[in-house]
Amino acid sequence: MSGSALSFTIFPGSILGFLQIATVLTVLLLLFKTAQFYLHRRWLLRATQQFPSPPSHWFFGHKIPKDQEFQDILTRVKNFPSACPQWLWGSNVRIQVYDPDYMKLILGRSDPKSHHSYRFLAPWIGYGLLLLNGQTWFQHRRMLTPAFHYDTLKPYVGIMADSVRIMLDKWEQIVGQDSTLEIFQHITLMTLDTIMKCAFSQEGSVQLDRKYKSYIKAVEDLNNLSFFRIRNIFHQNDIIYSLSSNGRKARSAWQLAHEHTDQVIKSRKAQLQDEEELQKVKQKRRLDFLDILLFARIENGSSLSDKDLRAEVDTFMFEGHDTTASGISWIFYALATNPEHQQGCRKEIQSLLGDGASITWDDLDKMPYTTMCIKEALRIYPPVTAVSRMLSTPVTFPDGRSLPKGITVMLSFYGLHHNPTVWPNPEVFDPYRFAPESSRHSHSFLPFSGGARNCIGKQFAMNELKVAVALTLLRFELLPDPTRIPIPIPRLVLKSKNGIYLRLKKLQ
């Protein structure tokens, strides 16, 4: 009896003591974190003191209204030459760069991708070419480069044309003589169709099979969720994010995306079990993207792990269709709003291709005016609006200003392409900026980034852009919808807040 009473009196005291200790430890942790925040912020302020910026809140940083990021960067381009700090919050700053000399210097270095900006993509696309750094990146880049040799790309032109024609046939069935259509979703299916056939040896048509729409939707969701997570201070922690509604949505989208790529890998492996197909592949002078991965041997002689294989497939599946879909959609919009240039392209294409029954690799170099218009559209609407680097060593820029190791530099291609000191009247669509006789800075136009880490598939992408523009202009006149003007917004690729609606007028 007395023993029970004794234990009863001690137990509440033990709880109280535990709570007191926990409170003290919590206060000490908060004090430590506060001191850490203060010291890191002081270091960042000193590190960026040579670069003026608009006023910011000490904790919340620069408050930018939702979907006003481009207006903000254009204001900075106008008021702060070459570069400007952007505080995401009190202890996180990045230097936005929009000057060609600055771009050339940073892209000529070997700084790694910014961990803060890119780590949130890892659960989705893994550590493939986009996220890898150092020697591993170099090995993978060298391994995959043959997939984009011109001998490999040549036969893809016909495949691209077939995919575009399927889309245009659908458009003819959907639209009347003069109807409005949201084009981005259709073009996304078409570019996914193309990449599945060219890079992943898939048969059939993505555009005619409804099951692929779930993958398209997953990519669209991850575009938004990844973008918003980077900018949310409360979602930096993986555990907290996993418990949030956005975290649950992201997990579901990751699963859908991975199911798609796993099926692609499984399907190709099954095809290669057939001895006839295997021998046909082995006799090829150049292998397709996925076959390179499946037959690859790293320098030590071992094959790629399943994890590394899927990371490269996930990376190129996304980058190989979504960026191109963005580029084509905005090119169509630019041509719709500049009818005189659209007609100039059409005349050039008609004289080259006639009715467009056939288009070949050699034709792609014979449409200079159309190429100029494509490049001008990519200048105004770059599919990838920015990339980030973490400085691995200090850097001094041509104007004498410098930054220390550890600072994140964001290369704003959108800011560069709209910089009036680089491109006079930057909002005016003028394809003659890209005429052969026009001169410009080597790093003033970077739709595919630059330096050693430029887009490995840039020639593939340019070919697809040309094929899509050529065949579409032979069958449709593109007209803007004045009631729904697209509003560009930055995501992982350039999107429109309200879709891209065009009036499609079938040509007789």
From Swiss-Prot:
Topology relative to the membrane: Multi-pass membrane protein
GO biological process: one example: fatty acid metabolic process
UniProt KW keywords: Endoplasmic reticulum, Heme, Iron, Lipid metabolism, Membrane, Metal-binding, Microsome, Monooxygenase, Oxidoreductase, Phosphoprotein, Transmembrane, Transmembrane helix
Domain of life of the source: Eukaryota
Pfam families: p450
Names of required cofactors: heme
CDD domains according to UniProt: CYP4B-like (cd20678)
Family of the protein in this entry: Belongs to the cytochrome P450 family.
Protein name: Cytochrome P450 4A12
Organism: Rattus norvegicus
Gene transcribed to yield this protein: Cyp4a12
